[in-house]
From Swiss-Prot:
SUPFAM superfamilies: Ribosomal protein S5 domain 2-like. Residues 1-11 have a biased composition (Low complexity). GO terms for biological process: translation. It comes from the Bacteria. This is Small ribosomal subunit protein uS9. Keywords: Ribonucleoprotein, Ribosomal protein. Belongs to the universal ribosomal protein uS9 family. One of its GO terms (molecular function) is structural constituent of ribosome. PANTHER family: RIBOSOMAL PROTEIN S9 (PTHR21569), SMALL RIBOSOMAL SUBUNIT PROTEIN US9M (PTHR21569:SF1). Residues 1-36 are annotated as: Disordered. One of its GO terms (cellular component) is cytoplasm. The keyword Ribonucleoprotein applies.
């Protein structure tokens, strides 16, 4: 019994006074990463940006995109919009894990891409709040971009553009 007590006291002292110091933390000290549940749950959400509204369903699959019945590269030929839409999957390391089915209407191409990204982020958040929410929120993908076109004012050519003024 006394020998067991000596071993435990030595183990405790060894933990308190390490023999070597490093600037890197060990794998055991790193923040515990929660296990992701099996990819069997689907999620659905709505995303909006400017005048565009996207109704998005994210279903476990092979990474197939269907937007208004068309493929991603067909609907958004601009690579920048394709990357923008795919960002929530990239940041969560879930590329190719889910199929995306979306119906988008209203607005222009940029607004539709932003609406789709928000809808995807919200549906991924719905699927697994514990693991996904903090990452998506930190990246800013769960926030709705409230910027909209400013209305035209009476007596002006546009929202703020007035006729040229001549002092003399």
């Amino acid at each position: 019994m006394a020998q067991n007590e000596e071993l435990t006291t030595e183990a405790v002292e060894a933990e308190e006074n390490p023999t070597s110091y490093t600037s890197e933390s060990s794998a055991a000290e790193a923040a515990p990463k929660k296990e992701r549940p099996a990819l069997t749950v689907a999620g659905a959400a709505v995303g909006r940006r400017k005048e565009a509204v996207a109704r998005v369903r994210v279903v476990p699959g092979s990474g197939k995109w269907t937007i208004n019945g068309r493929a991603l590269d067909n609907y958004f030929p601009n690579k920048l919009h394709q990357q923008d839409v795919n960002e929530p999957f990239k940041i969560l390391d879930l590329e190719g894990a889910y199929d995306v089915i979306a119906r988008i209407h209203g607005g222009g191409i940029s607004g539709q891409a932003g609406a789709l990204r928000l809808g995807i982020a919200r549906s991924l958040n719905e699927i697994d709040v514990e693991n996904n929410r903090a990452t998506l929120k930190k990246a800013g993908y769960l926030s709705r971009d409230a910027r909209v076109i400013e209305r035209k004012k009476a007596g002006l050519k546009k929202a703020r553009k007035a006729q040229q003024y001549s002092k003399r």
